[in-house]
Each structure stands twice: as C-alpha cells, then as structure tokens.
From Swiss-Prot:
UniProt region (Coil 2), positions on chain: 270-413
Region (Coil 1A): 107-141
InterPro entries, A to Z: IF_conserved (IPR018039), IF_rod_dom (IPR039008), Keratin_2_head (IPR032444), Keratin_II (IPR003054)
Gene name, Swiss-Prot/TrEMBL: KRT81
Quaternary data: Heterotetramer of two type I and two type II keratins.
Clinical disorder: Monilethrix: A disorder clinically characterized by alopecia and follicular papules. Affected hairs have uniform elliptical nodes of normal thickness and intermittent constrictions, internodes at which the hair easily breaks. Usually only the scalp is involved, but in severe forms, the secondary sexual hair, eyebrows, eyelashes, and nails may also be affected.
Region of interest called Linker 1, as start-end residue ranges on this chain: 142-151
Segments for region (Head): 1-106
Species for this entry: Homo sapiens
Protein name stated in the entry: Keratin, type II cuticular Hb1
Organ and tissue specificity: Abundantly expressed in the differentiating cortex of growing (anagen) hair. Expression is restricted to the keratinocytes of the hair cortex and is absent from inner root sheath and medulla. Expressed in malignant lymph node tissue in breast carcinoma tissue.
C-alpha cells in the first residue's frame, strides 16, 4: 500500500501507519527579553507499526513546549511490502482536534517573539550608538573643560589692566590737583594784584577829586579875577566919563574968560597915561593869571587823562586776566570733575569687572561641577547600558545555546525514532522559568505520557532525554523532577543517565 503525506512532498510506503496527522516537531519557548527560537523538522519514514501522539506540559510562566509527529529520515532503500487489510480500519488515535489552531497560535507567538528579538537587536544597536554618543560628549566636555581652564588668567589680566588704568587715573588726578593748587595760588596772586590795583584806583580817584577841587578853586579864582577886571574896566570908563564931564563943565565956566596961565608942564597930571599904565598892568596880570591857570589846568587835565587812560588800561588788562583766570578755573574745575567722574567710572568698572569675573568663575565652577556630574552620570548610564548589553548578550548566548541544543536534541530524537527506540524523555529547563519534561513514546499501541519537572536549574537551559545513546538505557530522573546541568553553568544537554561517561554537554 502506498500512502502519501505532507512531509516535504515525498511519498513512502508502509505496512500499517497510525499516528498523528503529518506535521512537524516543534519545541518553542518564551525566553528572557522576548528572544524566541523555532525549529521545524519534516520528513517521512516507514515502519510496521507506528503509534504517535503528543503530550505537552509546562512549568513556570511564559514557557510552553509542544511536539507533534516526530519524523525521521526514510531508509535509503524502500522495498515492496504486503498490506494487512485489517490495519486499514480507522483507528482512534486520540488526537486533539484543536492541534492545528494551537500550532497556528504557536506560529504567531514565534513570529511575535522573533519580532521582539529583532526589536531587542535594534535596541542593542541603539544603545551602542548612544554609547558612542556619550563617549563623544565625554570627549567634547573634556576638551571644553581644558579650554575653559584659561578663563581665570584672562580675567586676572583684564583686572590688572583696569587696575593700572585706575592707578594712571589716580596719578593724573594728583597731577591735576597739584595744577589746580598752583592755579589757585596764581589766582590768589592775581586777586591780590587786583585788590592793589583797586586800592590804587581808589587813591587815583581821590587824587582826581582833590585835583578837581583845586581846578575848581582855580576856576573860581579866574572867575573872580575876570569879574574884578570887568569891574575895574567899568570903573575906568566911569572915571573917564566923569573926567570928560568935569572938563566940559570947566570949559563952559571958563569959556567966557580968557586967561593965559603958563604952567609947568612937568606938574601936569596925565590921567590917560596913568590909566593906560594901570590898565596895562591889570591886563598883564590878567593875561599872566589866565595863561598860568590855563596851562596849569591843561597840565592837570592832561595828567588826569593820562592817569585815567593808564588806570583804565590796567583795569582792562586786569579784567581780561581775571576773565582768563575764571575761564581757566572753570576749565580746570571741569577737568577735575571729569577726572573724578572717570575715576569713579573706572573704579565702578573695576568693581563690576571683578564681580563679573567672580560670577564668571563661579558660573564656570558650577558648569564644571555640572559637567563632572553629567560625566559621572553618563559613566553610570554607560555602565548600566554595558551591564544591560552584557545581560542581553548573555541571554542571546544562552538562547543560541538553547537553539543549538534543541537542534541536536531533535536531530538525535529523530534518529532514535527512526531506529525504533521506545520511550523518549525530554526535559527542558531555563533560568527564567520552569522545566517541561515530556515522554515521547513510539510503539505499537502504547499512548503518549508525559511528566512535568519543576526542579530549578543552575544554567540558562538544560535539555535531557530519557535515553542514553551509547547504552540505550532509560533516564528516569527527569520524571522525578530533576534535570542534568552541565558544569559550564549556562546550558547543557544530557542524554541518558546511565553514567557520567554517556552524558553530553
């Protein structure tokens, strides 16, 4: 009889076949950090009597293992065999009708676990990039710290420059103060000179008043003399008229009498000559007095005019000097005020620069402390990331070892099933969950039984079978709840328990 199955599209013949529907043996797990492994085996085999089934057990959380249909490679040469008709009757294989749904769910779970594994790989890469970024930041902050160490000498140099400028300003202020004192002394001298000139002017004015009084007296005398001259002239005129009247009267009295009298001419009184002489004398006196008064008055006026001009010129020069000194005093006062303001500004700038320098230094120290704290935090974060990365890598290494272990286990079990060996005891353990042990039985009519092992394991994964490859003895220790763990402490595969010489790790 020829029977077709879905094992890789190959056909084989058998005398009688009873077993589960064609499928694959799948052992899955939900390990630490979502890393999944999947192994499927397909193939066909031939035998006289095959009874297959599965029984699944779980221990702990997030672990589940299933197996259905264990297949081994077909013999190299298939011969024609006779078919027992009685074996064609339908058999009650006690197969769960929901096995296909469970397998589909397992496929989806494996896909999700693979996606999580890929996400964890991406996360590892991202953490490596973050590690590189933190190293770059650390290098940058170290270089920046080296660059910021030159700020303090710059601030000290700038403060020293400002101090030198302040000293120069103080020296200039001292020099300006000495110049101001000198100018004040000169001003005091000019004030004294001005006071002397004022006193001289007062004296000259007093002299002018006295001379004016003298001139007034001379003018009054001149007026008196002129009045006297006029009075004398009037008197002379009166006497002349009187003399003429008397002569006329005498002539009228003697007109009728002719008397010849001879007189001595030397005894005659010549009034005209006398009057002329007196008049000449008075005219000479008046002329001399007038000339003397006019000359004295002109000389005094010229002298007073010269004195007034001289004192006015001196007063004008003194006023100009006083104005010049006032302008110089104002200019020097403004310069002194400007120097004081500049000195105060420079002192304020020095104080502000010192405050800014102190603030900048404190800010730089705070930033340095913050950068050191950030660097320390970055180092701690990097150490945590490295630890997590090592844990992830350890988990990945354990899962890789699990995958390799499952592959070797399935290959060995497949070979043993093909050779027709009886019960197979499978024990799977993980450090993040419990242990599942299943007994796979391939016999004529024996049902499949399984046992659950919940004993803890030292490594990440431990898988053992109840059959020893060299000696063919059964390992019953897994059914009791213990698993073989290799000395490496990570994962081990124990096949059989007949002795230490047949255990494989």
């Amino acid at each position: 009889m020829t029977c077709g199955s879905g094992f890789g599209g190959r056909a084989f013949s058998c005398i009688s076949a009873c077993g589960p529907r064609p499928g694959r043996c799948c052992i899955t797990a939900a390990p630490y950090r979502g890393i999944s492994c999947y192994r499927g085996l397909t193939g066909g085999f031939g035998s006289h009597s095959v009874c297959g089934g599965f029984r699944a057990g779980s221990c702990g959380r997030s672990f589940g293992y299933r197996s259905g249909g264990v297949c081994g490679p077909s013999p190299p040469c298939i011969t024609t065999v006779s078919v027992n008709e009685s074996l064609l009757t339908p058999l009650n294989l006690e197969i769960d009708p929901n096995a296909q749904c469970v397998k589909q769910e397992e496929k989806e779970q494996i896909k999700s676990l693979n996606s999580r594994f890929a996400a964890f790989i991406d996360k590892v890469r991202f953490l490596e990039q973050q590690n590189k970024l933190l190293e770059t930041k650390l290098q940058f902050y170290q270089n920046r710290e080296c660059c910021q160490s030159n700020l303090e000498p710059l601030f000290e140099g700038y403060i020293e420059t400002l101090r030198r400028e302040a000293e120069c300003v103080e020296a200039d202020s001292g020099r300006l103060a000495s110049e101001l004192n000198h100018v004040q002394e000169v001003l005091e001298g000019y004030k004294k000179k001005y006071e002397e000139e004022v006193s001289l002017r007062a004296t000259a004015e007093n002299e002018f008043v006295a001379l004016k009084k003298d001139v007034d007296c001379a003018y009054l005398r001149k007026s008196d003399l002129e009045a006297n001259v006029e009075a004398l002239i009037q008197e002379i005129d009166f006497l002349r008229r009187l003399y003429e009247e008397e002569i006329l009267i005498l002539q009228s009295h003697i007109s009728d009498t002719s008397v010849v009298v001879k007189l001595d001419n030397s005894r005659d009184l010549n009034m005209d000559c006398i009057i002329a002489e007196i008049k000449a004398q008075y005219d000479d006196i008046v002329t001399r007095s007038r000339a003397e008064a006019e000359s004295w008055y002109r000389s005094k006026c010229e002298e007073m005019k010269a004195t007034v001009i001289r004192h006015g010129e001196t007063l004008r020069r003194t006023k100009e000097e006083i104005n010049e000194l006032n302008r110089m005093i104002q200019r020097l006062t403004a310069e002194v005020e400007n120097a004081k303001c500049q000195n105060s500004k420079l002192e304020a700038a020095v104080a502000q620069s010192e405050q800014q320098g102190e603030a900048a230094l404190s800010d730089a120290r705070c930033k340095l402390a913050e950068l050191e704290g950030a660097l320390q935090k970055a180092k701690q974060d990097m150490a945590c990331l490295i630890r997590e990365y090592q844990e992830v890598m350890n988990s990945k290494l354990g899962l890789d070892i699990e995958i390799a272990t499952y592959r070797r286990l399935l290959e060995g079990e497949e070979q043993r099933l093909c050779e027709g060996i009886g019960a197979v005891n499978v024990c799977v353990s993980s450090s993040r969950g419990g242990v599942v042990c299943g007994d796979l039985c391939v016999s004529g009519s024996r049902p499949v039984t399984g046992s659950v092992c919940s004993a803890p394991c030292n490594g990440n994964v431990a898988v053992s079978t109840g059959l020893c490859a060299p000696c063919g003895q059964l390992n019953t220790t897994c059914g009791g709840g213990s698993c073989g763990v290799g000395s490496c402490g990570i994962s081990s595969l124990g096949v059989g328990s007949c002795g230490s010489s047949c255990r494989k790790c």
